[in-house]
């Protein structure tokens, strides 16, 4: 079994970025690993990269977006042992717990891909105005689901995959 060591950098726009300031942690076993401290400048850099990706990804064909999510799921499965090992080192969670979460994450990615292909996200509704409704008139109401751009996800460390890295909130 190979041993994987976290390198403690931030992944921003496909590049691994580090800062001079670090902190150390290994809640599972020790010895500690050094992790680069995030800065406001790195957050700004990540937000700009996410906005750039949003415009290209948001205008991609449905089939391409679904294929992208399925490819992420495939890569997570292909790197299952490494992801579990690093997740254990970073969080102290047991392997079985991370394996279950990894399966949930892959399932979420594939679920969102299937919703994209089916067009489920295109749901729109229109409730026409009822000016004579009593006791008050109802205005014309429309609901359209559309992407609005990147969101910040402050993920819980007790769900390092399913919520914070690749799962529900991120994939949605």
Where are the regions that the model predicts?
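N-terminal Rossmann-like NAD(P)+-binding subdomain of aldehyde/semialdehyde dehydrogenases
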Residues: 1-139
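Conserved small-residue-rich beta-alpha loop and adjacent elements
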Residues: 128-172
């Amino acid at each position: 079994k190979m041993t994987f060591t976290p390198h403690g950098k931030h992944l921003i726009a496909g590049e691994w970025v580090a800062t001079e300031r670090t902190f150390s942690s290994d809640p599972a076993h020790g010895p500690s690993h050094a992790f680069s401290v995030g800065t406001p400048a790195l957050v700004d850099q990540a937000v700009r990269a996410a906005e750039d990706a949003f415009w290209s990804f948001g205008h991609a064909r449905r089939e391409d977006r679904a294929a992208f999510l399925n490819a992420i799921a495939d890569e997570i499965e292909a790197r299952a042992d490494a992801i579990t090992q690093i997740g254990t080192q970073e969080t102290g969670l047991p392997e079985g717990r991370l394996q279950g979460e990894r399966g949930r994450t892959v399932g979420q990615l594939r679920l969102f891909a299937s919703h994209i292909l089916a067009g489920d996200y295109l749901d729109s509704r229109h409730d026409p105005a009822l000016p004579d409704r009593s006791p008050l008139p109802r205005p014309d109401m429309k609901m359209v689901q559309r992407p609005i751009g990147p969101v910040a996800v402050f993920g819980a460390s007790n769900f390092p995959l399913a919520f914070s890295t690749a799962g529900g909130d991120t994939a949605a």
